[in-house]
């Protein structure tokens, strides 16, 4: 029994056991089965093969050789006999070439050229006609090119194709158009000795900036600024702290945002106190000059009106709930709250006879003064002139 057959039978039994039990057999199970004899025989063959005394596994023939029925090539070495005659010399020259037989599917046979022995052989040249004549350029060529009866090509026996001579000043040549340097296509490489406005300055090239993935989003100018700040050559001053006024404004903004979130009314603004100083005259003298003239400034109005508006807005809900209730036909109904007045209330009064008479007397006052003094002076002018008297 061959070792390959034993191995295939053992593998087939192991696969069948694994399909049945779901696992490979253990050594105890192998010994309990009749397949143990084949295991023992397989190990015996393996030991004999490793020692080199037992039967060896035959090598597998390649597919190419098996398909062509390849057989080892046999070479036949024949020693040529000495032949003196002319016909015999021709036959020897033919036998020196290897006869190659067309390979068939059944067998391949090759005949090797005669081996060269180390012992020198006698030359088989009896007459000088056996030597191959060298071609001579003086031999005339006939209609069919041939040299000593051997057909040659048209160019054989010649020295070669003549080489074209280079143009010399004496020879006539076609004039070549001279290309001017200014008409050449400019190259992309700029001149090194020309100061270009687009080139990077040298002091920027000397600065080594390690760009991190976060700093790649920054501009080039920002990266240069950071490198200058971090360099020990020049230290920039730290950022200035905010002034108290700016800190107060930030605090007020935060407080307003908190009030909006809580639903509280906005914080009332405090009136600004401005100290006004006068150069020259004192405030008392200025009051005497100006008199009782009052200048209306809308920004000087008190803030109390704004506070009242805030309280009224906050109490609108309570006022609506506390509105009086009226009874109509035994059904209680709450009075609807109307819109708040947006215009100033005007009081219309009817003039009496006494007011009309006093108005007529005031109109006639200017006429009487004009007749007595010769000047037209009304009551308003008199009051304004009396203020500037000392």
From Swiss-Prot:
List the biased-composition ranges (Pro residues).
134-143
Give the highest taxon in the source lineage.
Answer: Eukaryota
A Pfam family that this protein carries is Drc1-Sld2
Give one GO biological process term.
DNA replication initiation
UniProt keyword list: Cell cycle, Cytoplasm, DNA replication, Nucleus
Record's compositionally biased regions (Polar residues)? 363-372
Which residues does the annotated region (Disordered) include?
46-148, 232-256, 353-372
**Where does this protein chiefly localize?**
cytoplasm
In the UniProt record, which is one GO cellular component term?
A: cytoplasm
Q: Give compartment(s).
A: Cytoplasm; Nucleus
Q: Name one GO molecular function term.
A: single-stranded DNA binding
Give the Basic and acidic residues compositional bias ranges: 353-362
Q: Which PANTHER family match?
A: DNA REPLICATION REGULATOR SLD2
The entry's function note states: Has a role in the initiation of DNA replication. Required at S-phase checkpoint.
Descriptive protein name: DNA replication regulator SLD2
Organism, by scientific name, is Yarrowia lipolytica (strain CLIB 122 / E 150) (Yeast)
Organism lineage: Eukaryota, Fungi, Dikarya, Ascomycota, Saccharomycotina
Q: Gene encoding this polypeptide?
A: SLD2
